[in-house]
């Protein structure tokens, strides 16, 4: 079922009973289910289920102690030639504070841009996710890009300059502070980067949390 956003997670006697959606036709519909896996992030999942009072105090204490999302910054730009020839991977930087990595999607998939145009994407993050200064640190990310590739900012045509946080962050929890996959509500599970198993991060953690939830459910 697509284009059917979840409006509520129904809980009775500490057990999940289903969800309420707005279906593709625009009608409110209740779906009965003994198991619910949410990928909306811990904060949104708690809200959909009715708020903190629905969950055990220990679960909410863990949630509130480290309720810090991980903002991310993103710049997409095009150049007439790639910053590095014959490179179809991901450059991860060790000499920067805010710039994390740079990719050249046009080198990975040439059909993504017109001939002679090379799309580049750079991602960065604040030095302290709890106290981000996104405007200043975004400019620092660009400065670090320039330091590694002198002249790039003058040559680049920027398509996207974005900062992601709040309800749509880089990750729903700061690294190392993920919530458990299982909640204190029976049958309700969280998957995604907000519930990162130890040693994982980002997209990898989303997949790992899904596997962990499957193991818990299937036994």
Model-assigned labels for residue ranges:
Residues 4-117, 129:
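Mid-domain catalytic core of redox enzymes
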Residues 102-219:
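Conserved flavin/dinucleotide-binding core of flavoenzymes
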């Amino acid at each position: 079922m697509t284009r059917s956003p979840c409006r509520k997670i129904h809980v009775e006697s500490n057990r999940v009973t289903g969800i309420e959606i707005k279906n593709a036709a625009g009608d409110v519909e209740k779906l009965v289910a003994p198991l619910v896996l949410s990928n909306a992030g811990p904060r949104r999942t708690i809200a959909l289920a009715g708020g903190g009072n629905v969950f055990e105090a220990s679960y909410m204490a863990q949630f509130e102690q480290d309720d810090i999302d991980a903002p991310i910054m993103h710049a997409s730009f095009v150049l007439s030639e790639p910053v590095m020839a014959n490179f179809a991977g991901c450059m991860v930087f060790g000499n920067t504070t805010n710039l994390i990595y740079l990719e050249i999607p046009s080198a990975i998939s040439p059909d993504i841009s017109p001939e002679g145009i090379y799309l580049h994407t750079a991602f960065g993050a604040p030095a302290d996710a709890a106290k981000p200064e996104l405007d200043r640190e975004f400019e620092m990310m660009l400065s670090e890009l320039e330091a590694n590739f002198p002249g790039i900012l003058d040559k680049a045509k920027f398509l996207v300059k974005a900062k992601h946080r709040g309800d749509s962050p880089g990750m729903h929890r700061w690294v190392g502070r993920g919530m458990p996959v299982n909640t204190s509500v029976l049958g309700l599970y969280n998957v995604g980067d907000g519930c990162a198993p130890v040693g994982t991060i980002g997209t990898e953690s989303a997949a790992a949390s899904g596997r962990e939830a499957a193991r818990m459910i299937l036994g």
